[in-house]
Amino acid sequence: MKKRKLILEDGTVFNGTAFGSDAESSGEIVFNTGMTGYQEVITDPSYCGQFVTLTYPLIGNYGINRDDFETVTPFIHGLVVKEYSEFPSNFRNEETLDEFLQAHNIPGIANIDTRKLTRIIRKHGTMRAVMVDEQKNEQHVIEQLRLAEMPRDQVKRTSTIKPYVVPGRGLRVVMVDFGAKHGILRELTRRDCHITVVPHNYSAEAILRLKPDGIMLTNGPGDPKDVPEAIEMIKQLLGQIPIFGICLGHQLLALACGADTEKMKFGHRGANHPVKDLLAGKTYLTSQNHSYAVNVSSLVNTDLELTQIALNDDTVEGIRHTAFPAFSVQYHPEASPGPEDTNFLFDEFLNLIKASKVKQGGEVYA
């Protein structure tokens, strides 16, 4: 099989076997510790522009199916695995992982020490990396990699271009798409919401014209500070319409309320991150994927209350506004993949909408 190199900006070189596309690619290298759900991970728009290292040692053994996509077009720039299974065995399998990556021009590399790679990322933090043919001059590639600028327009790439409607008979929810997973849409449709999905740069005025009962701020890739128009939009909507933010949406809500965000050393990516609910006194297992987090000290002197923390490192995992009907979480309550411990948050969102409508003297249709 064809050989390929994975080269990190710190000069570390991994020699492995190529699969997927023959294209050369660069991106930020991260790792995900989930044992299953590689299809959902690969198609999660929040990984836009990244090389995803899967720490579970065997990947591809159940192939790719049409049911588990989180977006139609994957946005990852590369896939890194220990061992790639060429012959998947699963009753839902429709194509191999290799065929899927080839179809979307995404390179992969296998037969490298993913434990060593993960330890490097944990020690030194996420960094730029490149996948190239084994013949390339390593020193030249490293020099070019260190000079490369990482893109900052990931949300623009992953957001819908124009609004569309997913009809339902219940509450009217406007979903602001920063790179939304289909799992969020599925949870709202299961609850019979009438959903209007709008682009990331939609104005507050345009959203209010849709007469929504609630606003969903979705997940998405990159630095929340790269989406200033969304922060301004949220500021204008606060207090008018109930808001629920997930992942990037959580960070944007925090920024809109005067808090701050910061980049983490290597982020949270996996399906078993424990989170403590400070209000309920309960602990949940959660699915997570984020490089940025809300700075806990920045919550002081804002109208935000800390509601949940990560048990591994005390990262802010949940906040709520003390005056307005708005709350958010850093993790993914829709899972996809992962545990569904916090799926009830979608019901809490709808209950918040209903309570707000009753308070305002309006009718509740669901």
Curated annotation (Swiss-Prot):
Region named CPSase: 1-171
Protein name per UniProt: Carbamoyl phosphate synthase small chain
Functional pathway: Amino-acid biosynthesis; L-arginine biosynthesis; carbamoyl phosphate from bicarbonate: step 1/1; Pyrimidine metabolism; UMP biosynthesis via de novo pathway; (S)-dihydroorotate from bicarbonate: step 1/3
Enzyme Commission number: 6.3.5.5
Keywords: Amino-acid biosynthesis, Arginine biosynthesis, ATP-binding, Glutamine amidotransferase, Ligase, Nucleotide-binding, Pyrimidine biosynthesis
NCBIfam families: CPSaseIIsmall, PRK12838.1
Catalyzed reactions: hydrogencarbonate + L-glutamine + 2 ATP + H2O = carbamoyl phosphate + L-glutamate + 2 ADP + phosphate + 2 H(+)
Active-site residue list: C247 (nucleophile), H332, E334
Any Pfam family hit: GATase
Residues annotated as domain Glutamine amidotransferase type-1: 172-359
Recorded family membership: Belongs to the CarA family.
GO BP terms, alphabetized: 'de novo' pyrimidine nucleobase biosynthetic process; 'de novo' UMP biosynthetic process; glutamine metabolic process; L-arginine biosynthetic process
Binding residues annotated for L-glutamine, in chain numbering: S46, G220, G222, L248, Q251, N289, Y292
Entry keyword Membrane: no
Signal peptide: none
Quaternary structure note: Composed of two chains; the small (or glutamine) chain promotes the hydrolysis of glutamine to ammonia, which is used by the large (or ammonia) chain to synthesize carbamoyl phosphate. Tetramer of heterodimers (alpha,beta)4.
Keyword field contains Amino-acid biosynthesis: yes
Purpose: Small subunit of the glutamine-dependent carbamoyl phosphate synthetase (CPSase). CPSase catalyzes the formation of carbamoyl phosphate from the ammonia moiety of glutamine, carbonate, and phosphate donated by ATP, constituting the first step of 2 biosynthetic pathways, one leading to arginine and/or urea and the other to pyrimidine nucleotides. The small subunit (glutamine amidotransferase) binds and cleaves glutamine to supply the large subunit with the substrate ammonia.
Gene Ontology MF, one: carbamoyl-phosphate synthase (glutamine-hydrolyzing) activity
Naturally occurring in which organism (per UniProt): Oceanobacillus iheyensis (strain DSM 14371 / CIP 107618 / JCM 11309 / KCTC 3954 / HTE831)
